[in-house]
Amino acid sequence: MSQLTHINAAGEAHMVDVSGKAETVREARAEAFVEMRPETLSMIVSGSHHKGDVFATARIAGIQAAKRTWELIPLCHPLLLSKVEVQLFADEARSRVRIESLCRLTGKTGVEMEALTAASVAALTIYDMCKAVQKDMVIGPVRLLAKSGGKSGDFQVDAHD
């Protein structure tokens, strides 16, 4: 079984030293969902929400969040991201929004947390913008879809998940 990398021999939390690692292209994709009533989703899709373009605001919030992950999650490294993409999809059949984020860099550590943070904050932004019309929206699940690059190798969620 793998060891927890952020715990030292004394059981204390610490930031991993990546100075000896090789720089490689690293990429991660994550997704999040926001479930809501059909009329709330319709308001977002039609652009009739009184606060403005919900998807555009959530996209920008997700991008900003990815760039600031190191300030939010204590043991994350500050990273020079080369790409952050946040896409939002209205799933009217299931009355939800699906958010997919992609983060990429050439560096010594992965971007999984940045991708997860981007998707999560985009979902939180949708909630914030729509809570005046619906307070019982549900956020989740949030998960890593794929990662590539680095010593630990590639990961991808099974297609049937």
Swiss-Prot record:
<dbReference type="InterPro" id="IPR002820">
    <property type="entry name" value="Mopterin_CF_biosynth-C_dom"/>
</dbReference>
<dbReference type="InterPro" id="IPR047594">
    <property type="entry name" value="MoaC_bact/euk"/>
</dbReference>
<dbReference type="Pfam" id="PF01967">
    <property type="entry name" value="MoaC"/>
</dbReference>
<keyword id="KW-0456">Lyase</keyword>
<dbReference type="GO" id="GO:0006777">
    <property type="term" value="P:Mo-molybdopterin cofactor biosynthetic process"/>
</dbReference>
<dbReference type="InterPro" id="IPR036522">
    <property type="entry name" value="MoaC_sf"/>
</dbReference>
<comment type="subunit">
    <text>Homohexamer; trimer of dimers.</text>
</comment>
<dbReference type="GO" id="GO:0061799">
    <property type="term" value="F:cyclic pyranopterin monophosphate synthase activity"/>
</dbReference>
<feature type="active site">
    <location>
        <position position="128"/>
    </location>
</feature>
<feature type="binding site">
    <location>
        <begin position="75"/>
        <end position="77"/>
    </location>
    <ligand>
        <name>substrate</name>
    </ligand>
</feature>
<dbReference type="InterPro" id="IPR023045">
    <property type="entry name" value="MoaC"/>
</dbReference>
<keyword id="KW-0501">Molybdenum cofactor biosynthesis</keyword>
<comment type="pathway">
    <text>Cofactor biosynthesis; molybdopterin biosynthesis.</text>
</comment>
<comment type="similarity">
    <text>Belongs to the MoaC family.</text>
</comment>
<protein>
    <recommendedName>
        <fullName>Cyclic pyranopterin monophosphate synthase</fullName>
        <ecNumber>4.6.1.17</ecNumber>
    </recommendedName>
</protein>
<dbReference type="InterPro" id="IPR050105">
    <property type="entry name" value="MoCo_biosynth_MoaA/MoaC"/>
</dbReference>
<comment type="function">
    <text>Catalyzes the conversion of (8S)-3',8-cyclo-7,8-dihydroguanosine 5'-triphosphate to cyclic pyranopterin monophosphate (cPMP).</text>
</comment>
<feature type="binding site">
    <location>
        <begin position="113"/>
        <end position="114"/>
    </location>
    <ligand>
        <name>substrate</name>
    </ligand>
</feature>
